[in-house]
From Swiss-Prot:
The lineage of its organism: Eukaryota, Metazoa, Chordata, Craniata, Vertebrata. Belongs to the frog skin active peptide (FSAP) family. Brevinin subfamily. One of its GO terms (cellular component) is extracellular region. It comes from Euphlyctis cyanophlyctis. This is Cyanophlyctin. Keywords: Amphibian defense peptide, Antibiotic, Antimicrobial, Secreted.
Length: 21
């Protein structure tokens, strides 16, 4: 479960960076 949460955070972070750029 924790691993999935980390993976989700990584994906969200990448999408946020893409939107900001």
């Amino acid at each position: 479960f924790l691993n999935a949460l980390k993976n989700f955070a990584k994906t969200a972070g990448k999408r946020l960076k893409s939107l900001l750029n």
